[in-house]
C-alpha cells in the first residue's frame, strides 16, 4: 500500500514522503488518524497544493509541544496517595494520574503522552517519568508520590 504522509511519523518518514506500508498499518492506523492519504494522482496533486500550509501547521505543533515540554520539565508534579506499611501504595499511580496532576499545575498533558514502560508506580518516592509530546519532542518529568497514611 502506497501512501503520502501528512505529518512526521516515527520510524516511517517525514511530511510529504511517499511510503510503502503494510495494508493493516495503513488502514488501521495511518489513514483513520489522518497521518496519511492514499497516493493517488488526485491526492498527490492536492497535497502539493497544500504542502506549505501543512508544513507550517506541523512546525507550529512541534513548537507548541516544545514549549509544553519546557514547562513540564520546570515542574515537580506531586501526587498524594494512600500508603500502607513500607511505603507501598494502595493501588498505583499511572499515566492518567500524572496527566491530571499536570493539568492541575496548569500544563496540558494527555494520558497517551505519558510513557511508563516499567508499568505504574506502586511505591511512594521520587520518579523521572518519560513524556512524548510530539514525534521528536520527548523528555522527562519529575514526579513525587507522597504517602498519605490516613
From Swiss-Prot:
Molecular function per GO: rRNA binding; structural constituent of ribosome
Question: What is the top-level taxon of the source organism?
Answer: Bacteria
Q: Keywords assigned by UniProt?
A: Ribonucleoprotein, Ribosomal protein, RNA-binding, rRNA-binding
PROSITE patterns xref list? RIBOSOMAL_L9
Gene3D superfamilies in UniProt: Ribosomal protein L9, C-terminal domain (3.10.430.100), Ribosomal protein L9, N-terminal domain (3.40.5.10)
Q: What's a BP term from Gene Ontology annotated to this protein?
A: translation
GO CC, sorted alphabetically, is: ribonucleoprotein complex; ribosome
Coiled-coil region(s): none
Q: Does the keyword Ribonucleoprotein apply?
A: yes
Q: Which PANTHER family match?
A: 50S RIBOSOMAL PROTEIN L9
Q: What does this protein do?
A: Binds to the 23S rRNA.
Record-stated family: Belongs to the bacterial ribosomal protein bL9 family.
Give the protein's recorded name. Answer: Large ribosomal subunit protein bL9
Lineage per the UniProt record: Bacteria, Pseudomonadati, Pseudomonadota, Gammaproteobacteria, Chromatiales
Amino acid at each position: 500500500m502506497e501512501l503520502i504522509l501528512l505529518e512526521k511519523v516515527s520510524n516511517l518518514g517525514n511530511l510529504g514522503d511517499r511510503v510503502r506500508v503494510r495494508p493493516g498499518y495503513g488502514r488501521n492506523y495511518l489513514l483513520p488518524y489522518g497521518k496519511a492519504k492514499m497516493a493517488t494522482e488526485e491526492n498527490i496533486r492536492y497535497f502539493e497544493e497544500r504542502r506549505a500550509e501543512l508544513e507550517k501547521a506541523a512546525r507550529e505543533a512541534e513548537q507548541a509541544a516544545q514549549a509544553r515540554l519546557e514547562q513540564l520539565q520546570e515542574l515537580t508534579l506531586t501526587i498524594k496517595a494512600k500508603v500502607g506499611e513500607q511505603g507501598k501504595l494502595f493501588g498505583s499511580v499511572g499515566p492518567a494520574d500524572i496527566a491530571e496532576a499536570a493539568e492541575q499545575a496548569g500544563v496540558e498533558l494527555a494520558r497517551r503522552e505519558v510513557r511508563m514502560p516499567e508499568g505504574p508506580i506502586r511505591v511512594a518516592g521520587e520518579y523521572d517519568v518519560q513524556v512524548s509530546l510530539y514525534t521528536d519532542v520527548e523528555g522527562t518529568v519529575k514526579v513525587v508520590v507522597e504517602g498519605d497514611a490516613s
